Amino acid sequence: MVNETSPSEYVNLRLVGDVVGPDFVEFLQDSQSWCSTALLVHSASMRLSAKGQAFTAELERFQLEVRDEEEWPGTRLFGHTRPVYRFRLDELSADYLSRSASSLLSLKPPDRLEDLCLLRPDGSAWLGSVTHERDAWLQLKNDEFSKLCEKAPSWFERFS
């Protein structure tokens, strides 16, 4: 996917702790101002529980595609692939995610898919995560950063 914005036009923020409860709900709601697609990944290293299978089945109503991929924001595999689920990000899907998981980093097997990424309409990553490593980050354009800072998200810190 082509990203026409140069890296200097971005502000990079790394997650400090986790985005939990009402903050997670608000975060998913706010993200819709900039993002239209989300993705989650099925980890081959851990089977999904019955709850995880139900989570994935329910996600199908928002699904755009499922494709075996070797790369997504934050991860590059060598010699193998994982199923990557892309789904539309809207009020209903954001509500489903926030009801299904108590926090950003709780999106992981065995009860859920993992590595939530939120993508702008041009396909560039706004949020990336590697949940089993408890790592998440935002790559914001300057105007997005200004608007998001109005809410003062204390769960992220700047990095270069």
Language-model features: where?
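Structured alpha/beta or helical-core interaction and ligand-binding surfaces enriched in interleaved
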Residues: 1-160
